């Protein structure tokens, strides 16, 4: 039985053409996870929770499969290093330091949205202490933030680099990231704004990983910090006015996404330029050291 399962997994991973397993993997895992969640309804799982539980099952299966996938397809013996969850070199900053740096960038980006809201009297501070909200924010940070970064900047980006090349790979992962998170039930211009902001965020996160020497934790801090930070602000710390401008808080009506606002788009564009300048400078420094030695 185990030998049959192993053979089936190897067959899936090594399917040809080479791009086919990439497009087949997630639907197959989601179908398996959804099926397992459906079975739990027989023992009392609410039908409203099937999608969430199925997604959790699917991601756990994804993590279990990754070591085999990386060894067979990427020919790398250290899967968690390849995904960016463990450092490649001893002299690199700790994962906690890299995570903290990403969190600080998320705080700065959110501040660029919150300060104009307060100064323009489109929002005011409120405080409703809630342990449940803090726990939810923690889950968003280390649940959604970590899971999505493993999926997009850990696994998908590497696969797209292998299939399309480095330049097309980084653009493609950002495009897929934006499309997956877009809402298509809004007008054309709000949707384009949201797609643009999410695309820029995908590029920023990819370059963040490059600057962090392959570590994924800076991406987790930045991405998860934006999600959990905006959640706490919107649900707990800020009372938004009904006339708060969409160019500031983003499209979405009563459930806005600030990444689609002009302020976030401008800030992400600036951050992308800063990161790219820093990355080019680090490459130049490495080249000089190599030539000197």
Give the residues covered by each predicted segment:
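Small-polar-interrupted transmembrane alpha-helices in polytopic inner-membrane proteins
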Residues: 110-113, 137, 141, 145, ...
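Membrane-interface helix/loop boundary segments of multi-pass membrane proteins
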Residues: 147-172, 207-215
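Juxtamembrane helix-loop-helix connectors linking adjacent transmembrane helices
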Residues: 2-9, 36-53, 76-150, 157-158, ...
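N-terminal membrane topogenic signal
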Residues: 1, 5-23
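Aromatic-anchored segments of alpha-helical transmembrane domains
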Residues: 26-34, 110-116, 174-183, 224-236
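Alpha-helical transmembrane segments in multi-pass membrane proteins
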Residues: 15-75, 96-102, 135-136, 256-266
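Functionally important transmembrane alpha-helices
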Residues: 35, 193-250
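C-terminal membrane module of polytopic membrane proteins
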Residues: 224-293
